[in-house]
Swiss-Prot record:
Alphabetic keyword roster: Acetylation, Cell membrane, Cytoplasm, Endoplasmic reticulum, Membrane, Microsome, NAD, One-carbon metabolism, Phosphoprotein, RNA-binding
Additional free-text comment from the UniProt record: Ablation of expression in HeLa cells causes imbalanced dNTP pools and altered cell cycle progression.
Required co-factors: NAD(+)
Effect after changing residue 62 to A: No effect on interaction with SLC4A4. No effect on interaction with FIP1L1
UniProt name for this protein: S-adenosylhomocysteine hydrolase-like protein 1
Positions carrying Phosphoserine: 2, 68, 71, 74, 77, 84, 391
SMART domains: AdoHcyase, AdoHcyase_NAD
Species whose genome carries this gene: Homo sapiens (Human)
In-chain residues carrying the UniProt-annotated modification N-acetylserine: 2
PTMs per UniProt: Phosphorylated at Ser/Thr residues between Ser-68 and Thr-72 in the PEST region: required for interaction with dATP-bound RRM1 and ITPR1. Phosphorylation at Ser-68 by PRKD1 and CAMK4 is required for further phosphorylations by CSNK1A1. Phosphorylation is induced by oxidative stress. Probably phosphorylated by CAMK2A; phosphorylation at Ser-68 may be required for interaction with SLC9A3. Dephosphorylated in response to apoptotic stress conditions which causes translocation of both AHCYL1 and BCL2L10 from mitochondria-associated endoplasmic reticulum membranes and promotes apoptosis.
Effect in UniProt of substituting residue 82 to A: No effect on interaction with ITPR1. No effect on phosphorylation. No effect on interaction with SLC4A4. Decreases interaction with FIP1L1
Encoding gene per record: AHCYL1
Length: 530
């Protein structure tokens, strides 16, 4: 049974008809305007950046920026912080000054500073522990006289760390440890605030080393502390400016890759200053490496590939804290997860967590996603890549770009096709495609973001490590690699507990005596495995 047409109220029918005519006229007028607007063509780069050799001056153009903008850069573009010429001119060829007249920096666009400042302020809201440390120690200025040269990811979270170091009395010069992880607007905000920062998203390898060199090689300014992430800064100083180490009081290193390089130097007797291994501190291993990766692996994969995880077969290479975080997230969304491991202890942990431990060769033909988390080199070789199924996704959650043999894919018979920012299709002669993310570099910071609160824990640990090394009396630390004192780990954790309204139980005198502990800690021996 059909319903009768609705009857308009008396006197309203003609008004509705006129309103409809006006609405139609406006709609067609708008459509005509849209039709006349010229269509913008997406520009794809003809040549891929070759990272096996230093490019020429004309080869310094940002690869990622010439193709597509990151999620954060799109906001700044919409707010008219950038113009089309920014993608054509290398920051090294620009003459920029901040509002104070200083040009002691090199960033993508200093006009992005206002937007970057808002990003930093947002990050500060979830980094209350670092802000608390800044307020507690600001009067004492424990880093007064410190000249810190840093090479880390330059994000809103690390900007909070850098500005905390400055508030505690340090002078800082900074570069990026990854060519894709810099937030341009944040770098601009730091430059506007007076920090000598040399970094932008999409640097070439030549740019990367140039930025590090500008931080170290400065007339009238010599660093006495190093904060490194990956060991590239430390390597550059050893290679180019070994005399700088005469004034360096210590190195703080936060990544497994950089720590490995420090231990190699120590073993060879070439480590000439004390170094603090932040990566293996409890507050880095058990929080940043685990929880940060558990959340950011999914974010990075979703943003780049729109992949559905349920039912997908995924192999994760390495079951350390990073691997554990990745596997937990993938398993929770229904992925079928395999593990590769060299360590029988980690392998047994994987088995008891419900994962199959396999050799990569055994599953490489069937898996949909390959993730590396080892800190090693050539974990995924050209042979593995040749045997992968069509549309297999390959990415890295370790620090450096050595885990996947990307260099072996730069051959004439393979075609590279950039399909979106940080996503390349590598096409074999038979038409097979492998989806390579961030050119084998760190997925989460290259393609997405990471949880601010977790980074607050790591940043606070780094700040305390710098304070400890800088103020340590002569002789406390020798030319070796050290772990952060347990008491400092506990202090970092205690600063973050108020965010959860958590309240610690206090030992009685009798209980403390029974356990042989100080009531105020440390509560665990150095050999304790959390």
């Amino acid at each position: 049974m059909s319903m009768p047409d609705a009857m308009p109220l008396p006197g309203v029918g003609e008004e509705l008809k006129q309103a409809k005519e006006i609405e139609d006229a406006e709609k067609y007028s708008f459509m005509a305007t849209v039709t006349k607007a010229p269509k913008k063509q997406i520009q794809f780069a003809d040549d891929m950046q070759e990272f096996t050799k230093f490019p020429t001056k004309t080869g310094r153009r940002s690869l990622s920026r010439s193709i597509s903008q990151s999620s954060t850069d799109s906001y700044s573009s919409a707010a008219s912080y950038t113009d089309s010429s920014d993608d054509e001119v290398s920051p090294r060829e620009k003459q920029q000054t901040n509002s104070k007249g200083s040009s002691n920096f090199c960033v993508k666009n200093i006009k992005q500073a206002e937007f970057g400042r808002r990003e930093i302020e947002i990050a500060e809201q979830d980094m209350s522990a670092l802000i608390s440390l800044r307020k507690r120690a600001q009067g004492e200025k424990p880093l007064a006289g410190a000249k810190i040269v840093g090479c880390t990811h330059i994000t809103a979270q690390t900007a909070v760390l850098i500005e905390t170091l400055c508030a505690l009395g340090a002078q800082c010069r900074w570069s990026a440890c990854n060519i894709y992880s810099t937030q341009n607007e944040v770098a601009a905000a730091l430059a506007e605030a007076g920090v000598a920062v040399f970094a932008w998203k999409g640097e070439s390898e030549d740019d990367f080393w140039w930025c590090i060199d500008r931080c170290v090689n400065m007339d009238g300014w010599q660093a006495n502390m190093i904060l490194d992430d990956g060991g590239d800064l430390t390597h550059w100083v050893y290679k180019k400016y070994p005399n700088v180490f005469k004034k360096i009081r210590g190195i703080v290193e936060e990544s497994v890759t950089g720590v490995h390089r420090l231990y190699q130097l120590s073993k060879a007797g070439k480590l000439c200053v004390p170094a603090m291994n932040v990566n293996d501190s409890v507050t880095k291993q058990k929080f940043d490496n685990l929880y940060c990766c558990r959340e950011s692996i999914l974010d990075g994969l979703k943003r780049t590939t729109d992949v559905m995880f349920g039912g997908k077969q995924v192999v994760v290479c390495g079951y350390g804290e990073v691997g554990k975080g990745c596997c937990a997230a993938l398993k929770a969304l229904g992925a079928i997860v395999y593990i590769t491991e060299i360590d029988p202890i980690c392998a047994l942990q994987a088995c008891m967590d419900g994962f199959r431990v396999v050799k990569l060769n055994e599953v490489i033909r069937q898996v949909d996603v390959v993730i590396t988390c080892t800190g090693n080199k050539n974990v995924v070789t050209r042979e593995h890549l040749d045997r992968m199924k069509n549309s297999c996704i390959v990415c890295n959650m370790g620090h450096s770009n050595t885990e996947i043999d990307v260099t072996s894919l730069r051959t004439p018979e393979l075609t590279w096709e950039r399909v979106r920012s940080q996503v390349d299709h590598v096409i074999w002669p038979d038409g097979k495609r492998v989806v390579l993310l961030a050119e084998g570099r760190l997925l989460n910071l290259s393609c997405s973001t990471v949880p601010t609160f977790v980074l607050s824990i790591t940043a606070t640990t780094q700040a305390l490590a710098l304070i400890e090394l800088y103020n340590a009396p002569e002789g406390r630390y020798k030319q070796d690699v050290y772990l952060l004192p347990k008491k400092m780990d506990e202090y970092v954790a205690s600063l973050h507990l108020p965010s959860f309204d958590a309240h610690l139980t206090e030992l009685t005198d009798d209980q403390a005596k029974y356990l042989g502990l100080n009531k105020n800690g440390p509560f665990k021996p150095n050999y304790y495995r959390y």
